[in-house]
Amino acid sequence: KRYPASTTKIMTALLTLENVSNLDETVTSEAVDFENVTADSSNAGILLGEQVTVRDLLYALMLPSANEAAYMLARHVGGSWEQFVDMMNERAAELGCTGTHFCNPCGLHEDDHYTTAHDLYLIAKEAMKDVTFRDIVSTVQHRMAKTNLHEERIILTTNQLIFSSFQPWSYANCLGIKTGHTSQAGNCFVGYAEYGDAKLFSVVLGCSSSSKEYPTVAASFTDTKKLCQWGFENFTSKTLARQVEEVTYTKVKLSTDTNQVILTAKNDLVSLLPRELDVKDLELQSDIPEEVDAPIKAGDTIGSVTY
């Protein structure tokens, strides 16, 4: 059980993308969007009565971690931010989160607003399936469109791993996702990185605001980089079974054509495994009936195998 701080906004973005079909529709900020946002908390400078597109609100949410954007999106999607929080908790349960409870859409501290590293991974994994989300969280800077109260403005990411490729703590393999910080939560970061065919998620919570290597950089970033580098150095994607290759077979009854049928994997089965592991050394455990009754056609599911 940990406090997530602004990594909460991954769920806010996910629900917005799942429920809003037109990201160019505008949302007008209201007084309620600022009631729970402290003056010194992260923001995008959105003013009362300002009309901002959902798309720009998502960028404001995920790059500078704007709390007013979180409340605007929550109200727009849920009807009220309180109803939206109910949606957040329902969606978390649907994703298999067992240690998460949200109280607000932005992550500002409340004692009953908590999660776990594994639950954040489940939420982030689902969010990263969305192309727009992936584009947003891998963006360093975004130009928000002119509004009724603002000229164009540029907002910047708080993700120090991608902010500047010239800094020694940057990490070229990092493609997102979200930072977080409160005094109670410490420094938090949900990360995602790719190297070749390998893909890694990382979640670090409660980190120091100063790393050993770089005193001005939070340990959440340097720890994430170390975790991902270790992961890529020691693990790689390996194919356990290919769609067209025989995995096993089973007997067939009541058929005049054959007494057995070849079984193949429904899709290529790929897993992230230790580099030194030989796939041939893995033990195959099958949950397949010894025999099945005809008729059987290509594509029918007969059973499952576990490596």
Task: Label every PLM stretch briefly.
Residues C97-T98, H109-Y114, H118-Y307:
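Domain-terminus/edge residues, biased toward the C-terminal soluble/receptor-binding domains
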Residues K1-H118, L122-V131:
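Active-site-adjacent loops and short helices of periplasmic peptidoglycan-processing enzymes
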